[in-house]
Structures are given as structure tokens and as C-alpha cells.
Amino acid sequence: MTEKIYYKFIQFALGTYEGKEFLDGSALNGFDWQRFYDFAKKQTLVGIIMEGISRLPKAVAPKQSLLMNWFMMSQNISRKNLMLNEATVGVYNRVKAAGYDCCILKGQANAAMYANPAARTPGDVDMWVDASRKEIRQLAQTLAKENGRIDEESYNHIALTTNGISVELHYTPGFMANFTYNRRLQQWFRESIDAQCRNMIALPDEAGEVAAPTADFNAVYQLYHLYHHYFYEGVGLRQVVDYYYVILNFELGVLNCRLRDEELKNCELESQNSKLNNSKSAKPTIQNSKLKTQNSLTRLGLWHFAGAMMYVLHEVLGLPEEKMIAPMDKKRGEMLLNDILCGGNFGHHDERHAWGRDTYDGNGFKHGALGHNLLRLHRDLRLLRYYPSEALSEPIFRLWHYYWRWKIHQL
């Protein structure tokens, strides 16, 4: 019951639910605000939920001390967003100036879809660069020269810090453990990159413009991203809210893309009759895009997880079925939602898995590698029933990846 009230309040905070029971205080009698605050921190939704609190009558709002803490954290989130918007545009322009096409993945590009972008807790700058691994290594060295450092190189990106901002330069936006699905995923990425690097959006606070993924690409890619994190560590409601906006933006993005294509073909709709015809054809266009997206999800092995995520979006954020890109899968969805509630942001708060987390001593020496790998196997076994292809492939991929890292370090 408590979670149901939380879900409704999140919808109220996002502006998608009227919330009369919150405005008149009837749902908040004896409400445990401290517990809700802890929930908001665990799920990295402090700024989002503050949007709802700011609309409440004073009589039903949190006590002054808690309210001030909440407000100060929200203001800090807002300041970080302002800084990161400017930093994102700065890094994007530097990469473009170096001669590479690129686009911003997730992050501030996702924030731009929010009603109040400043309420979303920001992360780092993820950039997909259309270049070879060797070129991206050189690019990372160039960016790190300005008050920065190279942090690490992984299979799909190089992480660096420049002017205090964490940046990931991606060779590819991601990978899958199943080799067949991974091959298809990489092919899909290669076929998609040009369109993503041409799709310009304006970041909030008049920070400037950057390239960001199209709506139809995001519907598949960000679902893959959630699936990947679900297997390797976990996902939280912050990531779910991001994907909620991706789905809401899907239909609008499809129509905008269609109109841009028609403009490029000099097919401007000048007469009222033309506009009427365009309106009639909008629904089939959206349906065709959904079918194309569903085909991609099936081909990439994401169909079952898509159904689970649609269930979570419906239960937590009230997503209507007509907006969904796949039918709800209740069994997988209930398991996913339970893991989200237990684990919080990227699974970092899941006490069920505390035994497997990496630990470090004062010198930064890792003691938890064994526990980390056992935890991976434990997660694979838990998910085997519902996602067998990835669960069975993950241990094999991990061995291959260990060899890949060893080989990279020899270079």
C-alpha cells in the first residue's frame, strides 16, 4: 500500500496525475515523510519528488527541518544540471572541432525531455563517437590534457575526467553477452549512427545544441541499456522515469521525423486539405514505427524485457497501454519491479547482494573480486528462468572479456 502512494505521488510530481488527495491532504494523514525521503534518495528521485512537495499546502508538507534538507538537495541538483548542460555542450563542440561526428547518449539529452529538466539528478557525459578505437584513444588523450586524466578503457568506451566532469567516449553504445544478439546489436548500431549524429536538440538553460538519439532509436537503445544494467548490477526508478519520457516522446518524435523527411523532399503541406490528409496518416505512421521497433526488440532478444518494463511503467508511472511498445509481461514485470525497489539506483542499495560487492582498503586494493564474480553467477541463476539466452551466455562472455582486457593491457 505504501508503494502505491509513492507511485501516485511520483506521477503527481511529474505532472501526469492531478493528485487531489495530495492537494487536500486526505492521502497524507500520518504520512511518514522521512521514510519517503529515504526512498527518494535510494531511487535518486529527490529533485523529482520535490516538484510535488512544492505544490502541497503547508499544513500537509514535511516538517521544516526535513523540508529544508530536501530543498537544499534539490537546489544542488539544479546547480549541477546547469553546470553539466554547459559542460556537455563544451565537450560535444570539442569533439566536433576535432573532426568527429558524435552524439550525446542519455544524460542531459534525457533531461531535455522532462517537464523540469533541472529536477532530474544528473550523471556524467556519455558520448558516442563515430571513430575507430585508436582514434578515440587519441581523442581521449587530447581532451584529458585540459585539467584532466584518463580513468579506464573498457570494451565499449574510454572513461576520462576533464575539468572535473566525468566523460565516457563510446566506440559503441553497448554490448550483449550472447554473441548472436551482440553481433546483431553492433550491426544495428553501425546502421543507426549517421542518423543519431544528425539529430540536433537544444539543451536546457540555453546551453546550446548537441546531437542526440532519435526517438525510435532511443526506444530500443535505452531499453537495451536498462537490460544490460539489470543483468550486471540493477536499475532504479531514476532510470525508469528516464525511459518513461523516452516512450512518451516516441510518438511525437516519429511525427517530427516524418515532417522533417517531407520537408527535405519539398513536400510542404500548404492547403487545409493536405493538413487533413497528414492528420489521417499520422496514426498508421506511428503504428508502422511501433512494428519496426517491435521487430528490432525481437531480433535483439529484448522482447521479454520490454514486456517487463511496460508492466513497471504502467504500475509505477501509469503509462497507458496504447502508448506501450510491447504488451505487458506481468510475471517478469513483478520480478523486475521488486528488484528495483530492493536495489535502488543501479542496484547499489540491494542488501540481498551486499556479500558480493567489491571492497577496497586504504590503498585502493580490491579484495572483492571473488565475491563480485560469484554475485554475477548468482544474478545469472536468478534471471535464467526468464532471460535464458543472456544468463547462459554471461559467464562465457566474462571469460572472453577477461582475455580481451589482458590483451589490451599488453599493448
Predicted region positions:
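Conserved NTP-donor binding/palm subdomain of two-metal-ion nucleotidyltransferases/polymerases, i.e.
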Residues: 1-123, 129-251, 292-411
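Arg/Gly-rich low-complexity intrinsically disordered repeat tracts
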Residues: 249-295
